[in-house]
């Protein structure tokens, strides 16, 4: 948003012996150009879209987490949501997330999930809300435990059967014909283990690997329906050949007809959960570069990392630290404009006045006040000042 700036009054000159009443009119009129500039300055800063033309047809999917409980916000966090330290059971919070995402041009959420009573309940609530709001869903199945060790194959197979039988037929999962499941952590499993789970279920589900390089994908490509790389910690300024690596991975997935979901993130900082790497956000430039690199890799979708991963600080959800900046930036990249969104303090539909509109209203009110004051001064002076002789 443009700044208010500072504007001086042009001096009123009486050297041609005009009536003093005119000088007050000059004062009033001298404000008009300044306020015109002010109004222009209140307009939102234009953002050049990186998803122009045919690129807009590429789905933008944000990774979404439903694991939050109020006590979780007390550990390993340096930023917090504008909506407060919520529980993922809070329906109004979830509904607001979905509405914000849709307004920003996000097509769907990739939901982190495995079958537990709590996560199933939350997934079902999200399905209902997303269906009503027109947001699509996919699943990132958490194949590793909290120690980053692989879950038993029998557990994974059972969970995917539950998903297939209970949820997969819902139209909210209709992104690529069949419901999409990204198996997180496939690099920890042998081809035989992946085959044991994937082969009997690919008739009903699109099962993607989550391999981190082409060599890893090559060992599984005939067992899965593509690859989705969750690369949240890359620094585009320092990683050599970063865009080329994504392009290579895209070609590998497409070589035998698989899907390729390319990653993009706004930044990264997982030091409070044991990490050491920090990728600065650079006021949105990091995300812009990562989005552009992802698009260059000819993806079938972009996996935006993330909506609300606050522990690794990849979130774009409106927050205390970044406010609405990253949702607005996504909207600008996706749509070419910042929408007049969002009542970010509310769970109501986003139909309230935006910050640029509020600034314009304030500027107009200021203009009106100046005109009224100036006209009042004119009226008072005109009663007491006679015309100058000779006019």
Model-identified regions with their sequence ranges:
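Bacterial N-terminal signal peptides
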Residues: 27-40
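C-terminal membrane-anchoring or membrane-association module
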Residues: 373-391
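Glycan-processing catalytic domains of CAZymes
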Residues: 46-356, 361, 372-377
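Residue-identity detector for glycine
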Residues: 2-8, 41
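Hydrophobic H-region at the start of alpha-helical membrane spans
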Residues: 30, 360-371
């Amino acid at each position: 948003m443009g700044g208010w700036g500072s504007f001086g009054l042009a001096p009123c000159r009486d050297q041609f012996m005009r009536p003093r009443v005119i000088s007050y009119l000059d004062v009033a009129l001298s404000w008009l150009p300044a306020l015109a500039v002010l109004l222009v300055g209140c307009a939102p800063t234009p953002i050049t879209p990186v998803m122009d033309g045919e690129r807009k047809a590429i789905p933008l999917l944000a990774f979404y987490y439903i694991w939050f409980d109020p006590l979780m916000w007390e550990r390993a966090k340096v930023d917090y949501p504008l909506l407060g330290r919520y529980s993922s059971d809070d329906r109004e919070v979830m509904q607001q997330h979905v509405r914000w995402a849709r307004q920003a041009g996000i097509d769907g959420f990739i939901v982190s999930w495995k079958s537990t009573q709590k996560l199933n309940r939350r997934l079902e609530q999200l399905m209902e809300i997303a269906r009503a709001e027109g947001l699509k869903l996919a699943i990132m199945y958490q194949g590793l435990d909290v120690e980053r060790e692989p879950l038993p194959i029998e557990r994974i197979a059972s969970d995917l059967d539950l998903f297939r039988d209970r949820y997969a037929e819902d139209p909210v999962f209709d992104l690529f014909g069949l419901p999409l499941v990204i198996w997180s952590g496939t690099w920890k499993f042998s081809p035989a283990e992946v085959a044991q789970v994937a082969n009997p279920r690919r008739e009903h589900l699109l099962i993607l690997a989550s391999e981190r390089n082409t060599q890893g994908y090559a060992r599984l490509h005939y067992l899965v329906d593509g690859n989705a790389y969750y690369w949240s910690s890359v620094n585009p300024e320092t990683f050599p050949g970063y865009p080329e690596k994504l392009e290579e991975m895209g070609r590998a997935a497409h070589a035998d007809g698989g899907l390729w979901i390319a990653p993009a993130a706004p930044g990264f900082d997982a030091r409070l959960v044991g990490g050491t790497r920090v990728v600065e956000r650079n006021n949105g430039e990091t995300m812009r570069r990562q989005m552009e690199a992802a698009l260059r890799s000819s993806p079938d979708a972009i996996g935006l990392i993330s909506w609300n991963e606050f522990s690794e600080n990849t979130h774009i959800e409106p927050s205390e630290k970044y406010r609405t900046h990253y949702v607005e930036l996504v909207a600008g990249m996706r749509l070419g404009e910042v929408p007049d969104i969002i009542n970010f303090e509310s769970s109501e539909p986003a139909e309230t006045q935006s910050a640029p509109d509020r600034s314009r209203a304030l500027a107009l009110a200021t203009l009106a006040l100046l005109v009224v004051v100036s006209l009042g001064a004119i009226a008072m002076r005109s009663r007491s000042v006679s015309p100058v002789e000779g006019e």
